[in-house]
Swiss-Prot record:
One term of GO molecular function: porin activity
Source organism per UniProt: Pseudomonas putida (strain ATCC 47054 / DSM 6125 / CFBP 8728 / NCIMB 11950 / KT2440)
Sequence intervals crossing the membrane: none
Cellular component annotations (GO), alphabetically ordered: membrane
UniProt entry tagged with the keyword Methyltransferase: no
Gene3D superfamilies: Porin (2.40.160.10)
Name listed for the protein in its UniProt record: Porin-like protein NicP
Gene: nicP
Induction summary: Repressed by NicR in the absence of 6-hydroxynicotinate (6HNA) inducer. In presence of 6HNA, repression is alleviated.
Amino acid sequence: MQGFTAPRFSSSARLAGGCIAAALCAEATAEEAGFIEGARATLQARNYFFSRDYADIKGASTQSRTQEWAQGFILNASSGYTQGTLGVGVDVTGLLGFKLDSSPEHARSGLLPSLDSGKSADEYSRLGAAIKFKVSQTELKVGELMPNLPVLLFSDLRLLPPTYQGAMLESREFAGLTLSAGQFRSTSLRDSSNSQKMYALVNDPINPARLARFTSDRFNYVGADYAFNDNRTSVGVWQAQLEDIYQQRFYSFKHAEPLGSWTLGVNAGYFDAREDGSKVAGDYDNHALFSLFSAKTGGHTFYVGYQQIGGDDGFIQVGANTNPMGNTLPTYEFSAPGERSWQVRHDYNFVALGLPGLTSTLRYVKGRDVETGLGFEGRDRERDLDLAYVVQSGPLAGLGIRVRNVMARSNYRTDIDENRLILSYTIKVF
């Protein structure tokens, strides 16, 4: 292994670093209880093995397997707020990843940065901070952020999560109503030590990376969610813009209805997107509808989902993230132009059988009617099996083990067989 290098400090870390002193000064004029006693910090150790075999390869790539093993550490530290009308605090995020096993012919798994030589980096790291302000039930954060929004979903799918540099405002001044707004200026990808401009990722069967060369340093959003009916029903409206590339609207509806020993639920949404501003990436047209119905009783939860993509293009999002649509899976997205897909899924919590900590997920999604541009209709399908266990007691209490097996098949894209093994353990620092 190469010698360890110091962590990269993002611009937000330098910005918020200067603000930490300001927060402490503000705190000095108030009671120490809020800023210090409200502080929390956790350190998660994450061991990740990722293996993906490619068969019936379609496209320019000739790589038949991706396989890497890595160790990561995720530090999340958060202060409380200073006392008074305006509360001030600081959040700090530290990320560190090490290569345990990799080879040039099996690299590019998303766990580790790829070097020009084709090898994966021995280690990488990031350190960032955000200053936060709070008045009543309104909070503003500026700096290094991990947003989890329907228009920019938090995608912690590999060794380390991605982060964004910018500002987020959230207000809960009125019962049931959450108002959100923000702007991000750059991102640090999940397998990178550096920050960069943001790019759009579109599901295009012919050229999946056709928008990746177009970047923007402005992602703007506003949104409103309203929960009512004892929080069993919620509706949402969001607007997002990756400046000069695309703009997108999102409408959501969620409901849960108790019915005897059952709880029935629905999660539905509609996206509508088009080109934005100077259209540096050209014209764009997409709308997407999804619905996921659930029925829960005892340890069982059953799901049935339907998803439909319309417009001239596939679904679009900021890369490299996922999205909240019901049939989007970590391997296939089922969001190509014209695609219609159906899902059946079963989750089980084994606590119902006296085995607390053990859970399973089995799901199957099938898609058709893909406009491939190759002279035939595209079809794809995927089966995922997840088993997870969290040790409940003893010296290893809290240790999480997750196993995932995936089989994905298509007549217009590369077939995939995938296995993941993830061990995680979170330590409460203070």
